[in-house]
């Protein structure tokens, strides 16, 4: 029994596990702290999916149309519910009035065009009559006036495609430039109050800082209110008046659509003996031209706003120290400074032995030291056993 107890005591004195050598360089082998980890691929995918030019698979065109139609329906329902009773009554009256006017136009279209034909001829034969149309188009460029599209259609109705387009094109460039300068100077207070909080123009302001003349041309092609767009662009300090005039001149070919529609209306008004097939061709050309202009304008508007959103994401990433989406991640946020890591290592509590520090408590037995189990319980047991024998005797 004493021998077994002694061997058991020695076994308990042995280390529980073998001594593991500490890492040679805690800085090199330690795990990266959580604040220095790179951005995960999921986050990059989220940024890339937000970009309209990313390579992520998109939904079909049919699904996009259905989704946009559903969104438009919900917006209309919400807008209708927010109207007061008086506003709802006025909206119903306006809808009924529009239906009546369309019906009257379809029934009495020949009489309407016949009455307009002499008016167009007198205007065309009037000396300097084109200056009236030029002045009307020029004035329509200043906010908050309306009627710009009507003046272009009248130009085609009265003067036809070549001459009518030349009149409105030159007037558009001159009017837009003057409206731009006026909105930046004498009308600046009114313009900021009018369009300063418009989210559409706030988004376009960011794109102008990156894309310059290209985005200016896209803005001029967008189906935005003509006079309001002139005023809004004037609030962007990065736009130069000459660049704005150049962009307006570059997109004047779009006016051919409106002028062409006006010329077709003039043909319907001036030719009383036109057969049905010719009338149908003119009507079809009007519908196709209008639809083409609306579609192109809508597509350009969507792409312009998408570009604005992409640049907004890039600005946010640049502010946070990240890189733009869709580009190769060259360097991301990381605490790679060895000095900082060394300072952090000094503050940590190390469980490894350090030769530079005084000796600390250890569970390992030094061979030079006396075994604590060599004396103590064994001697006491021997003493107790001896006393027992003496007592028995």
Curated annotation (Swiss-Prot):
Region of interest called VTT domain, as start-end residue ranges on this chain: 156-265
Gene Ontology BP annotations: mitotic spindle elongation; vesicle-mediated transport
Pfam families: VTT_dom
Cellular compartment(s): Golgi apparatus membrane
Cytoplasmic membrane side: 110-125, 188-241, 301-393
Mode of membrane association: Multi-pass membrane protein
Cellular-component GO terms for this entry: Golgi membrane
Keywords: Glycoprotein, Golgi apparatus, Membrane, Transmembrane, Transmembrane helix
Covalent S-S links between cysteines: none
Entry keyword Glycoprotein: yes
Membrane topology, Lumenal segments: 1-88, 147-164, 263-279
Recorded superkingdom: Eukaryota
Transmembrane regions listed in the UniProt entry: 89-109, 126-146, 165-187, 242-262, 280-300
UniProt region (Disordered), positions on chain: 374-393
Positions of glycan attachment: 82
Domain remark from Swiss-Prot or TrEMBL: The VTT domain was previously called the SNARE-assoc domain. As there is no evidence that this domain associates with SNARE proteins, it was renamed as VMP1, TMEM41, and TVP38 (VTT) domain.
Family that this chain belongs to: Belongs to the TVP38/TMEM64 family.
Function comment: Golgi membrane protein involved in vesicular trafficking and spindle migration.
Stated name of the protein: Golgi apparatus membrane protein tvp38
Species the sequence originates in: Sclerotinia sclerotiorum (strain ATCC 18683 / 1980 / Ss-1)
Organism classification: Eukaryota, Fungi, Dikarya, Ascomycota, Pezizomycotina
């Amino acid at each position: 029994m004493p021998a077994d107890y002694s061997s058991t005591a020695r076994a308990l004195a042995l280390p529980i596990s073998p001594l593991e050598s500490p890492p040679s360089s805690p800085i090199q082998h330690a795990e990266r702290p959580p604040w220095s980890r790179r951005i995960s691929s999921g986050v990059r995918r989220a940024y890339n999916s937000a970009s309209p030019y990313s390579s992520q698979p998109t939904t079909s065109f049919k699904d996009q149309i259905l989704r946009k139609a559903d969104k438009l329906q919900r917006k209309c329902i919400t807008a209708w519910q927010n109207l007061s009773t008086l506003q709802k009554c006025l909206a119903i009256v306006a809808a009924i009035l529009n239906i009546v006017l369309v019906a009257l136009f379809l029934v009495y279209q020949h009489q309407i065009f016949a009455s307009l034909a002499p008016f167009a001829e007198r205007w065309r034969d009037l000396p300097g009559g084109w200056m009236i149309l030029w002045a009307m188009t020029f004035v329509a460029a200043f906010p908050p006036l309306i009627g710009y599209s009507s003046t272009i259609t009248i130009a085609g109705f009265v003067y036809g495609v070549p001459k009518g387009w030349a009149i409105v094109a030159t007037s558009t460039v001159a009017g837009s430039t003057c409206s731009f300068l006026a909105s930046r100077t004498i009308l600046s207070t009114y313009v900021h109050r009018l369009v300063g909080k418009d989210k559409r123009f706030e988004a376009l302001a960011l794109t102008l800082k990156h894309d310059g003349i290209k985005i200016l041309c896209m803005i001029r092609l967008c189906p935005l209110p003509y006079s309001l767009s002139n005023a809004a662009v004037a609030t962007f300090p990065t736009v130069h008046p000459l660049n704005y005039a150049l962009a307006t001149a570059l997109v004047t070919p779009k006016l051919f659509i409106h002028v062409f529609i006006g010329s077709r209306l003039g043909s319907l008004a001036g030719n009383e003996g036109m057969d049905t097939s010719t009338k149908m061709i003119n009507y079809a050309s009007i519908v196709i031209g209008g639809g083409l202009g609306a579609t192109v304008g809508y597509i350009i508007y969507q792409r312009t706003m998408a570009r604005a959103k992409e640049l907004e994401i890039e600005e946010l990433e640049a502010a946070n120290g990240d890189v733009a989406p869709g580009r190769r991640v060259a360097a991301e946020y990381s605490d790679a400074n060895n000095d900082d890591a060394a300072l952090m290592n000094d503050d940590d509590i190390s469980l490894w032995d350090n030769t530079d520090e005084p000796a600390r408590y250890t569970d390992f037995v030094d061979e030079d030291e006396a075994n604590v189990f060599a004396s103590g319980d064994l001697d006491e047991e021997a003493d107790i056993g001896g006393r027992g024998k003496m007592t028995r005797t």
